[in-house]
Amino acid sequence: CESTLVDDLLHGGYSRLSVLDISQTAIDFTKARLGSLASGVEWIVANVTEADFPKHAYDVWHDRAVFHFLTAASQRHAYVERVANAVRPGGHVIIGTFGPEGPTKCSGLNVQRYDADSLHGEFGARFRLIDRQKELHQTPFGTTQQFLYCFCVIGSRDACPKSATSR
């Protein structure tokens, strides 16, 4: 939980925030960093592919660097179904994964790399691809890793047209 997204959102006045991590240690670290602001966040320690989320409870789902660790099709399917259930129709989904030129391993684990079409293909027609963006992420070790971010709007179970701007 080195990401400071939750800090930035809290300082920006956002509320009704949830943070999920599989690691209690990471959650505790982030809570300590936030101090009294941590009480304004729902903290969830769980495997995202197994967690139960309330139906249509979220306006925005942001995943930076989890999805690419899901190397089994069954894990990816479980993840997508949870997102589709948890995010309200018309809600936004932002997924950040390693891009096609990103590393093949991270922290000793195999990862799945994506381009925008293959990542959107994992999510399917319910997720309308609005935009995509590649980024070179500077690691703490002084190297760079290619990331791909896809921005989607979720529709109903009925098919949504696929569209995107190119970058």
Features from the language model and the residues they span:
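Class I (Rossmann-like) S-adenosyl-L-methionine-dependent methyltransferase catalytic domain
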Residues: 1-56, 70-167
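Short catalytic micro-motifs in class I SAM-dependent methyltransferases
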Residues: 65-69
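A conserved beta-strand element that flanks and buttresses the S-adenosyl-L-methionine
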Residues: 62
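Conserved acidic residues
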Residues: 59
